[in-house]
Amino acid sequence: MKEVVIVSPVRTPVGAHGGALRDKRAQDLAAIVFKAVLERTGLDPAVLDEVIIGNIGSPSEAANIARVAALMAGIPIEVPAFTVQRNCASGMQSITSAYQAIQTGDGEIYLCGGTESMSNIPYVLKGARWGYKLRHAELTDALWEGLTDPICNQIMGRTAENLAEKYNISREEQDQYAVQSHKKAFMAQRMGKFDDEIVPVEVVKKVAGQEVAREKIIHDETINAGLTVQKAALYPPVFKENGTVTPANSCPISDGAAAMIVCTAEKAQALGLKPTARIVSYAYAAVEPAYMGIGPAFAMPKALKKAGLTLDDIDLIELNEAFAAQCLAVGKEMEAQGYNWNWDKVNVNGGAIALGHPVGCTAAKLVATLTYEMQRRKARYGIDTMCVGGGQGGCLILERIPMD
């Protein structure tokens, strides 16, 4: 097997829903991180074998968004590109697709990542193309519809309620978890831990349609440093009557993009690139759609087995926080399977409840956060894992490459 490495992972700051990045389309955000990777590496984009990016929203004006963003970023016309979609693991799929292509000899070096502008997912008027003969037409919120599973007909938050019931997770436990996520993220931001992975996004401020200023967004804007358990308790459940899942203990809808080079170790050396980690193994698992949040507890064991590792070998875990209930359920399920689940290793700089979950971007974004923290701590192994809408889980195991 060829040794496959990750080079210069970067991400945009995460924008709140309708926030600072709302006027940036998913292709704009992707082009920004593509350019940043090329600038940081000094890489001639003509050497790329292909560009692969994950995206869920699939904007109609940017069909095959990987190709659109690649050309916007100045990547030569001769470099092909394609887009992958595995819901919340789309960014991870871009990396593992590149890994597979490398192992089969299709190429040696790929530009990978994920992008999402949930703020720009539209309302749609279904049936309007052929006209309406009678009565009212109804606008469909494509974002809300996209977050609803078509098999079990439950929105993602309702599937988190299912896990809270199954694993006996209380509202207070969820709120406490969420508060800790915000506290850790706030401290990490304050200490500059995200600075190396974030590339600024310039936005235009307008008044009455006229440009009045330009501003560079450099920080994630979804962190709520003032959240307490008492304040979290005031939020009502929104997915089930008398439920426990609330906006306070769920990830916020958000916007962002991430990118990196995935290539062979030999190619990195030949081009003078400095890898930050190597890919040890990866795995995807499938579960009941109504319990989709438990997916990581079945993907992690598969990836560990492939790598010949135990959970005790892992130093850091980035577990995407779609919902506090879902994360707590994953921990309980891992323990039930006999694993030594150590929360001190998990999301040490906070997670998506505080930092956002731009769905097609997140799995790639977590690679950036994980690898930089692995370098700081001189950790050997790290896991990037997430639940996946539709009833799946994804897991990527990385090994740090010293950059000293």
Question: What is each model feature region?
Answer:
Residues M1-K24, A36, T228-I294, F298, ...:
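Condensing-enzyme catalytic core mediating Claisen C-C bond formation in acyl metabolism
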